[in-house]
C-alpha cells in the first residue's frame, strides 16, 4: 500500500504550516506522556492507523506500560489512569466527537477541575492539532509501521 498523497511533494509548505503547533506543544504546560496519551486516544476515535502507530511508539519510548496502552480503548472502565488523565481523555473525546453534540459542559467541567486555564488551553490545542493530523493522514492513506520515535537523552 502506498499513500495516495505525498504532502511533502504536493504542497511543500504544508508541514511548515503544521509544525509550529507541534513545536509549541512540545514545550507547553502539559507533560509529554499526557500529550501522547491524548493524541493516541483521539487517533483511536478517528481510526487513524498511522497516528495510532506513531503515538503508541512514542508512549512506549516514554516508558508507558502495555497495560495502560491496551486499556486506553476502555479507559473509563480501566483502573490505569489518574483523575487528571481521565479528565483529559474525556475532554479529548468531547472535542474529537464535536459533531455529535458539541463539547459537553460535563466533560469541560471535569477537565477544568484538573487543569489550570493555561493547561486547558494547551490541552484543547493538542486535541485540535491531532485531529488535524488524523484527517491529513487518513485522507492521504499514510502507511503505518515505519515511524520510529526519537529518544532524547535526559540532561
Residue ranges and their predicted role:
Residues 1-155:
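Hydrophobic alpha-helical segments
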Amino acid at each position: 500500500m502506498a499513500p495516495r498523497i505525498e504532502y511533502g511533494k504536493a504542497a511543500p509548505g504544508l508541514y511548515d504550516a503544521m509544525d509550529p503547533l507541534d513545536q509549541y506543544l512540545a514545550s507547553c504546560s502539559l507533560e509529554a506522556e499526557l500529550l501522547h496519551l491524548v493524541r493516541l486516544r483521539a487517533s483511536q476515535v478517528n481510526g487513524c492507523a498511522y497516528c495510532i502507530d506513531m503515538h503508541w511508539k512514542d508512549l512506549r519510548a516514554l516508558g508507558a506500560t502495555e497495560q495502560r496502552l491496551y486499556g486506553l480503548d476502555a479507559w473509563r472502565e480501566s483502573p490505569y489512569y489518574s483523575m487528571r488523565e481521565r479528565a483529559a481523555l474525556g475532554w479529548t473525546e468531547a472535542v474529537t466527537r464535536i459533531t455529535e453534540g458539541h463539547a459537553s459542559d460535563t466533560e469541560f467541567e471535569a477537565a477544568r477541575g484538573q487543569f489550570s486555564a493555561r493547561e486547558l488551553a494547551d490541552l484543547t490545542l493538542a486535541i485540535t492539532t491531532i485531529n488535524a493530523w488524523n484527517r491529513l493522514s487518513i485522507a492521504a492513506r499514510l502507511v503505518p509501521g515505519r515511524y520510529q520515535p526519537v529518544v532524547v537523552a535526559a540532561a
